Amino acid sequence: MKRTFQPKNLIRKRRHGFRSRMATRAGRKILNRRRSLGCKKLCA
């Protein structure tokens, strides 16, 4: 059985990147929460 995590940078950016977060209302909520927490890195 192969492992579940097969790292690929493009897929990582597309799923968890800044633009995909900005695209939905829920994603913007995530960004705002991470800003309020003071995270240096907001997303992938």
Curated annotation (Swiss-Prot):
InterPro entries: Ribosomal_bL34 (IPR000271), Ribosomal_bL34_CS (IPR020939). GO terms for biological process: translation. It holds the Pfam family Ribosomal_L34. The keyword ATP-binding does not apply. It comes from the Bacteria. The keyword Ribonucleoprotein applies. GO terms for cellular component: ribonucleoprotein complex; ribosome. GO terms for molecular function: structural constituent of ribosome. Keywords: Ribonucleoprotein, Ribosomal protein. Belongs to the bacterial ribosomal protein bL34 family. HAMAP family: Ribosomal_bL34. This is Large ribosomal subunit protein bL34. The gene is rpmH.
